[in-house]
Design a protein with these regions (language model features):
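Long amphipathic alpha-helical segments
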Residues: 61-103, 319-354, 359, 373, ...
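Extended, helix-rich architectural segments
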Residues: 1-325, 428, 432-435
């Protein structure tokens, strides 16, 4: 006996369960690690500072990531072509060249390719995995056009087109027409002033970066395409929801905040960490603008764009479905064959979706270096403004407490005032800092002497001579990151763009 189709209420319940148990959900270990990485990237205080003591914070995480990015961007974006399609046979040469030109045009011209690549790599280096979303956007683009003095025939010819929508229309009489009227003309000649919008084309490939805090994936997943559940949660205004789903009856009273956890997501520590450096999130409670919150069209709701494998029709075979949910309302429920997200990570862990970020490797070094520098600076303060032993009644304490160049201290007997020795830490601290820099170089593949990568280092025709030009074994770590990005993320993105067109 065949099972019945899943109801909308059952779908919403299933989706909520998948969201709360997914990786990247607010408050889980992945989310906390990414929040901590953002704090280290901004070199924010650790929370263990002592008043009156040094509060120095080292910037190892941000320095290392910012040193790696130029090498990666030079490898991927220094030339005119982000991707090149190779022909299989001689007959494929024209098609391969055309595909190369068109995909590069879509990525660099139709979309902000450089910005996408830069943000993608930054997310991966800092937050374990960088995520981009690529899809075919069927939203119509309309151009505004204005015409004046059209005759009746011209006007009818214009507005009869299916790709034209009239915005404004004014009928005017031609000047001097009464004097020129003949007996055959029973009506005066009229002209038309009209403003229209013309459909400039339907659909294009759209690529956008997905903030790590907005991406969810089922815990057992090894990659995106094989995952049971993937979700992109994003804030949308009521106006945007109505534009996206014009055929749906969207009632603000039934949407709530877009889900039972909407309040928690608005104040998610991981999301707010991105704004913590300049405290730019302090005035809007995590999202939105309080000044416009009362305007209905600008009220914001959490939209969950979910890709779920489920036996929706009850035939015993699961299919991949795209479900867009706001609160308890399902706005879209379609069967699809592709999940439009692509991920890359600098250090891939086999059989696991989330890898390791560069920040994961060196955050402990930043804490140790900060502690050493604080101790070193406190030691220098103590040397410059040390402590003294004073024989009671044998020295003038006011003179001793008054710090001024060339000042004197009146004493009644020699040796009444003696300085307490403060051991110097400089030689040992600097040696330790150099040792930590060496550890950072071996872990992250970057040092203060690194000059980046050869732009030809990763190409297929690389010779033994070119490989020998690598200055140190540490730089091979950066090369491996670049190759990993190319094989697991960039190549897949270009392939998807090609398949969409």
């Amino acid at each position: 006996m065949a099972k019945e189709k899943i109801t909308e209420e059952e779908l919403v319940t299933r989706i909520r369960g998948e969201i709360t148990s997914s990786l990247g959900y607010m408050g889980d270990t992945i989310s906390k690690q990414r929040e901590q990485a953002m704090d280290y990237y901004y070199a924010l205080p650790f929370g263990n500072e002592v008043e009156g003591r040094s509060q120095f914070v080292d910037s190892t995480v941000s320095d290392t990531i910012e040193w790696i990015k130029p090498s990666l961007m030079r490898v991927f974006a220094s030339g005119d072509e982000m991707v090149k399609f190779n022909p299989v046979g001689p007959e494929d040469v024209p098609a391969a060249k055309q595909a190369t030109d068109y995909v590069n045009y879509i990525f660099m011209r139709d979309n902000p390719g450089w910005e996408i690549m830069y943000s993608w790599f930054t997310d991966a280096l800092l937050s374990k995995n960088g995520i981009v979303k690529v899809w075919w956007d069927e939203t119509d683009e309309w151009d505004r056009e204005e015409y004046k003095g059209l005759t009746e025939i011209e006007f009818e010819s214009l507005v009869s087109r299916t790709d034209v929508e009239v915005i404004e229309h004014t009928v005017v009489e031609e000047d001097g027409v009464e004097a020129q009227m003949t007996e055959e003309m029973q009506e005066p000649v009229v002209l038309h002033d009209v403003v229209i919008t013309r459909n400039a084309g339907k659909g294009k490939v759209v690529i956008e970066n997905v903030p790590p805090s907005e991406f969810l994936i089922s815990r057992e997943s090894k990659n995106i395409q094989d995952a049971r559940f993937v979700c992109h949660r994003v804030k949308k205004t009521l106006s945007e929801l109505k534009e996206m789903y014009p055929d749906e009856d969207i009632d603000p009273e039934t949407l709530g905040g877009g889900g039972g956890d909407s309040g928690m997501m608005a104040f998610s520590a991981e999301r707010l960490a991105r704004y913590r450096y300049d405290n730019s999130a302090s005035n809007f409670g995590g999202w939105g603008d309080a000044d416009v919150a009362d305007e209905e069209g600008l009220r914001e709701y959490w939209l969950h764009e979910c890709y779920l494998k489920t036996d929706y029709d009850g035939d015993g075979i699961t299919e991949l479905r795209k479900l867009c949910v706001v609160g308890n309302k399902v706005l879209e429920n379609d069967e699809v064959d592709f999940i439009p997200f692509i991920s890359l990570t600098p250090i891939k862990i086999p059989h696991k979706f989330f890898g390791l970020s560069i920040a994961d490797l060196i955050m402990d070094l930043q804490l140790i270096k900060s502690t050493l520098m604080r101790n070193l600076m406190d030691n220098m303060y103590n040397q410059n403004f040390g402590r003294f032993t004073v024989l009671e009644g044998q020295a003038n304490l006011d003179d001793l407490l008054t710090q001024r160049p060339g000042g004197i201290v009146r004493v009644k007997s020699p040796g009444a005032v003696q300085r307490l020795d403060t051991p110097t830490l400089e030689p040992y601290s600097f040696q330790m800092l150099e040792y930590l820099d060496g550890i950072r170089e071996s872990r992250a593949g970057i040092s203060k002497h690194s000059q980046g990568l050869d732009e030809n280092a990763l190409k297929s025709h690389t010779t033994a001579t070119a490989v020998a030009q690598v200055m140190s074994a540490a730089q091979q770590r950066v090369e491996l990151i670049a190759r990993n990005f190319a094989e697991t993320g960039v190549k897949e993105l270009m392939r998807v763009i090609y398949s969409l067109v």
